[in-house]
Amino acid sequence: MSVECWRDSITLRTYLQGPEDPHASLGRRHIYPYTMQDDLLHEAEDRDYLALHLENDLLHVIVLPELGGKVFSAYDKVAGREVFYRNSVVKPAMVALRGAWVSGGIEFNFFHRGHSHTTMAPVSAEMQEAGDEAGEGAAITVSNIDLTSRARWAITIGLEPGDPRLHQHVYLRNRMPWRQRYYFWANAALPALDDLQLVYPAHKARFSREGIVDYPMWKGRDLSLYRNHAVANDIFTLDVEEDFFGCYYPGEDAGLVHLADRAHSVGKKFFTWGTEDAGMIWVDLLTDEDGQYVELQAGRFVDQSIYEFMRPFQQMQWHEVWWPLHGIGGWVWASDEAALNFRLGEEGRAEVGAMTWRRHEGARIAVSAAESVLWSERADLAQNAPFTTTADLGEAATRAEELVVTIEAGGRELLRYVHPPEHTKHPSVLETGERDRPEPTPEEQCTAGELHLRALEAELWGRREEARRLWELALERDSALGRAHVGLGLLDYRQGRFEAARQHLQQAVDLDRHDYAAKY
């Protein structure tokens, strides 16, 4: 089956909102010139939404442009289940930057920390059919211009023939002639079932208000198990050296892998409202019949306290995939080609499971120790042909310092897994403790250079008046600090104070004729 794409409408029970605030929210700099969407009503009615569809023989995807361009549904036709948490109603609660927010599917958050300005607003959308720019596959691109920064974002959701993975291509562009901050996280909702297991290849994490903690075991508690999170919290992995993360549901024998080059998408987050009553109230606030959800998020940066600058007119893009798994009993490792489950038990017996997204006939799965093969078996692997077995590795497996599991096909190595994983063998450079950031130096003791760095951080966080104050203070302490003149010149330029901007930038050039930022 080729990839088909079409548009129609779907009807969803929708809890109504009153009119948006007619006035721009001047007191909320993080949303200006957007208005608030905070008049949430208790009445509901059936509403039709434009739905864009992609479908191949393995996956059926629905995107809703009128709800921020979110992926509303991704149905795994092989396993017969929704890949993500599908919320059958549109029931907003006060969560997003502008107020109203709905749960479910995959949402895309840009430029400012929090649920995006357009999460409950229509965005542009277009379809690329097979044979167009999408090649053999088909794709849906949703896009918008963020009014707070005038930067452009676009997400292309694509399917390929015979490929069970949902492809996500991210494009960001700074349309302005000055630097400005940016931020990106893809937020996938999944059902909050008691047996949910996280697969995050890390051994340190930033855990809510606890600072840096050991992961997954912390104070006798396995943080990789959803049921062990009684209260609402976030987990951000900190020392990830792999390109994957995801989850698995043993009861359903199904799960999910997210894959992306960590040079482009290093952030790996888990969020839950918690299992106690205080967290479960969000079930009634956000849905009618679909239960609780959790979030697996993939981000541009390590955690959501980080912004970076985009240069003037800079554009950037990268690729991510979401791959549904099933029938392999869990998973511990993944590559671009394969996913592996490996559980070593007593007396050298191991549970082994494997899956590949494309078909490989006669693939070889092998377990070795000290370059000696302890066990191997051949199998036909594919998305609709998961492989599982119990392998008898013998006593040598219990004595070996490490085991190497490989999946090979067609003369290529599709996956290599070292047990125990490399990231568990060496100490992290991060120290576990109640605080993961030192107390800042008092401002009156800061050097001009330190004040400049604080001003940059304030600019990154959108606190421009604070940045101005810090750069002016830096110049009081060192009048030859050209970087402070550049910072003030940029602030003045953005505010239309062109003569003041010219004076600051000229002073920076006079101090250093090689200051190309000031010359620009």
Show the residue positions of the predicted features:
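Extended, loop-rich substrate-binding clefts of extracytoplasmic carbohydrate-active enzymes
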Residues: L16, E20-R47, A51-E55, S103-P164, ...
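Structural marker of alpha-solenoid helical repeat scaffolds
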Residues: R477, D510-D512
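TPR alpha-solenoid repeat register
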Residues: A484, A518-K519
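A contiguous, surface-exposed recognition patch within enzymatic or periplasmic domains that forms
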Residues: V3-Y15, L52-E55, I62-S73, R81-V83, ...
